Amino acid sequence: DFRLKLLFEEIQELATAALDIEELNDKDDRYGLMQNLLKEMCDVVYVIKGMAVSFGMDFDGAFKLVHKSNMSKLPLIKDADGKVMKGLNYEPPILEGLVH
């Protein structure tokens, strides 16, 4: 699928941009690299939003609900590996009506 191939390419570019910052020794170059990282993040979101539109999905509406669901995990409970666990207040997102 074209969009999936494009998404993988954009994720690779995002990973490269993030690694460039981690490997940076000169703070003078950091601002430009941070701008590039932000651009690559936006490219990934752009492709994902395009994919959602092509499938008739309300990405922005779903994102808000998933964010609300993720915030319901508070207070944070982490497992031994540091992964955030679903706490007592967790509510899964209900995405009904967001796929057309």
Task: State what each model feature region is.
Residues D1-H100:
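Flexible "arm" and connector segments at domain edges
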